[in-house]
Amino acid sequence: MSQAKGLKEVSYVDIIGGGQVTIQGNYCYIAHMDAPAGTSILDISDPKHPKQVAHIPIPAGVHTHKVRVENDLMVVNWECPPPYIHDDSFQGGMLVYDVSNPAKPKELCFWKSAGAGVHRFDFDGRYAYITPTVEGYHLNIAMILDLKDPTKPEEVGRWWMPGQHVAGGETPDEGYRLTWCHHILRRGNRLYVAYWHAGMVILDIEDMSKPKLVSRLQYSPAFAHPTHTVLPMPFEVAGRKIAIVADEDVRKLRPSPPAFMWLVDITDEKQPVPISTYQIEGLENRNMPEFSGCHEPAEQVYSTEIPVAWFEFGLRLVDVKNPHAPKEVGYFVPDTPSGFDRPQTNDVFLTKEGLMYVIDRNRGLHILERA
């Protein structure tokens, strides 16, 4: 039976699990985790009664678990499924669709990358900020694509961690610190980049053709988990500029308690400083299997209450109005989907109206609101 505090369910959609959910207008777009399920589109004009209007299947051996929609364009990643092992016949990249009629998505192009493909990205309707594997580079790097002509995306610029450009004579610092670009969020002329075990990175993209490093913060290997998402708050909190930094509860360097969330002061963006953390009470000293702890926050927030997808422990609502002492003010832990051993809350999208669209990576979409 589901458990909730401070949140209540508006509706539930029994649908194949997903990696990301995004809302644009009256439509919900779900990028699924596993083939043959690719991307589903739901009419949510009545959030109490969502209706599926389209589905795009994919072939076996492909992973399209991320989706973004802006300006009637839908962008979907195309990569080799985990553990990202593939032969030379695999073609990774990114798909672009026209969704001016969401019930009839029309493919516009398939942008090709080398290697395993594109993992995650941000998209503002013109530019895509992607994390592709690229010929001559060790694992994924940061890249900016211009979709002015969505049938022919063009690279504008790229950035990589020193050591990744093996074709240029650099040597990757592998060891236990897997260095690759995991996720990017754009805010103004800055990119906030999660670089896995290499930490968080802030890039200046005033000149998009030449992204420049502003700063970097790394706390691995001292802490066992990789950095998943860097979300700058859209307003000052207690007079300071704050970033919500989520570690992901996977690929940990050693047995440890589940991953947690950091609050990082970026008032001086050249010197980001961690000032607090949030962990679910009672988990601080418990060694647990992967996919138990923190995953990622909603990437659009409108108050100090941050919805965070927390894998086995559902959705946690964390108030950061005191950035030195974040406090849980609500939670929703769904029922375990049939055929699985625990919930796996993977992603959440928060609307301006306060609805939270919460997708389980195995099965089910819950639409929630504050109680």
What are these regions (language model features)?
Residues 1-371:
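Feature marking well-ordered beta-strand scaffolds used for ligand recognition
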